[in-house]
């Protein structure tokens, strides 16, 4: 992989890139050509295809992954690619984490932490349920480890879903362990499963958009259905084990205003909803602060301005 931020004038390019834009244009000489914007997780670079009859030019569109051969040149002090040949790439030629913002945490280490949480659950039925998702269903687990946590709002990057899930579970477990009348196994199981239907609600990269069932039903109800189906298939759950876990899934957004069909009516459900909300809000604040530093849009005191998702104006602490 030749990452864009490492390219230099004179480099020969042979690599796969994500096509952000594709358009046809006419030069001052009257010659027609194609403009493409190539991207990976490190940045973007413009490409020029001067041979409009070049093989493969009609085989791809914006949003596709394309294998590009060409020369990196400098034009008006900006690097660009003079494309010689290109073709649509096959799925086994690229990894999405090379092209989109990715969790700063190692995926393998996050997987280990996930399985440690699963192993910590003592309730036999809850452990069977977690194993059914995260051990026995290899395709589900593979997707879960790389899926984004949201389309835009928070953790909207490769492996954002597992990063958010682990953070929520850590918070929820610590809160639950502070009280002797809260069922820690129920809290951990619900926290690990609360957002599993994000896999169905939002399409994976590069599309990163709401699916039809994501728009019409949403991940809360879809998640309820996924967990209920596994519970019924495994069998042997008591009514209390089943109903209380499903309630935690349905109520994890904390209020009907934010999409939960039920308010938290168990201490365990309240813990999960608060942990979920806390991690989401803190991530929104962290991402907003980082972005405003890049764009230099903070005010003189470091405040970022009112944020509709966080619900307030805020700044980073000046204490070090």
Give, region by region, the residue ranges found by the protein language model.
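OB-fold nucleic-acid-binding modules
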Residues: 1-13
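Short, acidic/hydrophobic/Gly-rich beta-strand patch recurrent on exposed beta strands
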Residues: 35-40, 204
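Divalent metal-dependent catalytic cores for phosphoryl transfer on phosphate-bearing substrates
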Residues: 152-154, 163-164, 174-291
């Amino acid at each position: 992989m030749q990452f864009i931020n490492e390219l230099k004038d004179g480099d020969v390019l042979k690599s796969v890139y994500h096509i952000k834009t594709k358009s046809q244009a006419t030069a001052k000489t009257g010659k027609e050509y194609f403009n493409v914007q190539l991207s990976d997780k490190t940045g973007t670079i413009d490409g020029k295809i001067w041979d409009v009859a070049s093989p493969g030019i009609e085989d791809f569109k914006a949003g596709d992954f394309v294998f590009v051969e060409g020369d990196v040149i400098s034009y008006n002090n900006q690097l660009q690619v003079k494309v010689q040949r290109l073709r649509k790439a096959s799925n086994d030629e690229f990894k999405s984490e090379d092209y989109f913002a990715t969790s700063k945490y190692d995926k393998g280490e996050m997987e280990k932490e996930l399985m440690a949480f699963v192993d910590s659950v003592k309730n036999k039925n809850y452990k069977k349920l977690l194993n059914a998702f995260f051990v026995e269903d290899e395709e589900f687990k593979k997707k879960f480890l790389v899926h984004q946590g949201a389309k835009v709002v928070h953790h909207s990057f490769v492996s954002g879903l597992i990063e958010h899930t682990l953070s929520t579970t850590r918070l929820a477990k610590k809160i639950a362990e502070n009280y002797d009348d809260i069922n820690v196994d129920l809290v951990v199981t619900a926290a690990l499963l609360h957002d599993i239907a994000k896999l169905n609600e939002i399409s994976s990269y590069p599309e990163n958009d709401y699916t039809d069932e994501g728009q019409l039903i949403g991940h809360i109800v879809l998640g309820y259905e996924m967990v209920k189906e596994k519970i019924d298939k495994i069998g042997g759950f008591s009514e209390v084990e089943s109903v209380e876990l499903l309630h935690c899934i349905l109520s994890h957004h904390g209020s009907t205003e934010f999409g939960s069909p039920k308010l938290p009516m168990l201490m365990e459900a309240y813990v999960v909803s608060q942990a979920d909300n806390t991690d989401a809000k803190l991530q929104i604040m962290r991402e907003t602060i980082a972005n405003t530093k890049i764009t230099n849009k903070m005010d003189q005191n470091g405040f970022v301005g009112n944020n509709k998702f966080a619900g307030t104006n805020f700044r980073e602490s000046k204490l070090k």
